[in-house]
Amino acid sequence: MIMHWEVKAMKRTLVWLLVATLLLTALPAAAEEAATSDVYRTLYSGEITTLNYLVTTTTNDFAISANVIDTLVEYDRLGEVQPSLAESWSTSDDGLVWTFNLRKDATWVDHNGEYYANVTAHDFVAAAKYILNAQNASSSASILYDVIAGAEEYYDGTATPAEGEEPAPVMEWETVGVKAVDDYTLQYTLKNPVPYFLSMTTYVAFMPVNETFLNEMGANFGVATGNDTILYCGAYILSEFAPQEKRVLTKNESNWDADNVFIERIEQTYNKEASTISPELYRRGEIDSASIDSTLAADWLADPETADLIRPVRQSGFYSYFYAFNFDPHFDEQYEPENWKIAVNNENFRKSIFHALDKISAALPYEPDYPETILFDTITPPAFVSLHGEDYTDMGALGEVTAAAQFDEAKALEYKELAIAELTEAGATFPVKIYMPYNPSVTGWDEECQVVEQQMEGLLGTDYIDIIIEAGPTTGFLDAVRRNGNFAIHKCNWGPDYADPNTYTDPFYDGTYNQPQMALYYNNEEGVSEYYALVDAARAITDDLQARYEAFAEAEAFLIEHAFVIPFGFGSGGYDANRLNPFESQYAPFGLSGERYKGQKVYEVPMNTDDYFEAMDAWEAERAALAAQEE
């Protein structure tokens, strides 16, 4: 049996001795100020659609869950795994069985902070059983049944068969590899060894739920009508919730780690114009956070009264943004969906668009000074995972992708001419209407769309394409646009759930983003989507990490080389106005860490640019010291 936490704890003790002096001498100016407020105030314009963390995988929804529900483990501010609801864990010698020993002082409370029950291993079993019931339509189900023994067979047995299909055998829950050995010992049995399994447990799919409360609530569990439809075991309680009015998170005094929760109250006020009015409210001291677009950032930096109020945005996560072509359009007839189907199924048409996009120009609304720093040419961001010193995005077929220029005016025009001939023969009409909605609550997205429209129509010609940009709703945008197929081309994003390239196949493999499996002409001899076949082959490799990574690289390269998507980069850059120190937040490229307020403080004096880079240097030095100690 391999014991994990105890060994790492001894190493960390030595590391902290090495960095203690560094911490004392390299604290940024903002960190030297005492926290003068227990309250953190923000505006928001997109309301949550559910509090049911067992079904949602939407960032806007689970940003609340991350703060009110704890996970088995968590990441600290340096990206190191720390115990949370699990005090320790171990792995069997064959890597198939993971055992978690839960703390006995973790409790469930209601929205008033009143004790309900202790958190036990049975709560994790109840959550898995709920997620793996196909009737509950959980977006997290595949995360569990991809790795847990017996989970997929159980899930299939709960599903309603399609017309003409035989139902799958109904399986007993005991065949699934999720087990409460006793009240405080939880065990997962996997299909195959999964080296990154621990990182998976920080995601919503592995959160617990109290089964008694779940059964009492029935279909009302997690309904986003109030704060009394879930229980709480995390750092905060959603003490007030009036949809499209306000949300208030209050420190959970019963939480096992309450001493490390420094912000007592988080006040989030709804305003559909939040992105527009937040900067001025921040300047007046009425709120504590505001996104600053590129135009305003230039003005503030030039003004001595505001120059010290903003700092660069920290790129703390690995959310990847990419333009996706929709192969199953469901938009209004005025945008000619049938004509779009003809066009999008022509590879030369897609490649003309692919090579016509000037990403540097499109990124200027987010990062006006160094736009190239937030851009990359793959779906998986660089530095996400590596092996033997080689970055995954440089491996195999992806290495060829990153070596080639994507914005290429000559190629765009060459593919345009090929597409015109083929599309004319296929019965398409010109210009091809390209419906491209955006979320008005996202700072800079409207400006980006305008830049893209002008730049691409200017290059390819308005006799070839007609890009139509339109503001979508601020609340329920994902449901109204992407999930309904209500777009021709759409800038989508995906954040990793665990530390393996497989996580970046999820939006394409299940077809939820742009339905690549419905593209014509890309099935193999067995009638299976070529992309699906490549992903299946990569997922089947569990004993050779080099071969596994190279196989996933081939699958990802397939999407890019055939222009199913246009890789973009990170979603933000530029500047932020905020009274939090971003280097105090939990850090991990996956899971929920980036959404948590635990460990952070509200400062009277916000970071300026100099403070930010000083803090970043200190943080990177601490990370380097840890890495050196662990080698």
Regions found by a protein language model. Give the residues of each.
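N-terminal lobe/hinge region of extracytoplasmic solute-binding protein
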Residues: 43-93, 231
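Detector for C-terminal structural segments
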Residues: 352-393, 444-454, 480-631
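Extracellular/periplasmic solute-recognition and catalytic clefts
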Residues: 239-250, 269-334, 360, 364-366
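Short, well-ordered beta-strand elements
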Residues: 36-46, 97-101, 124-127, 186-187, ...
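Ligand/substrate-recognition segments at binding pockets and active sites
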Residues: 243, 402-496, 545, 573, ...
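Gly/Pro-rich hinge or "lid" segments in bacterial periplasmic/extracellular proteins
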Residues: 159-175, 181-184, 189-267, 275-276, ...
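Alpha-helical secondary-structure segments
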Residues: 116, 121-126, 183-189, 193, ...
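Aromatic- and charge-enriched surface segment that lines or borders ligand/interaction sites
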Residues: 87-147, 187, 278-284, 339-345, ...
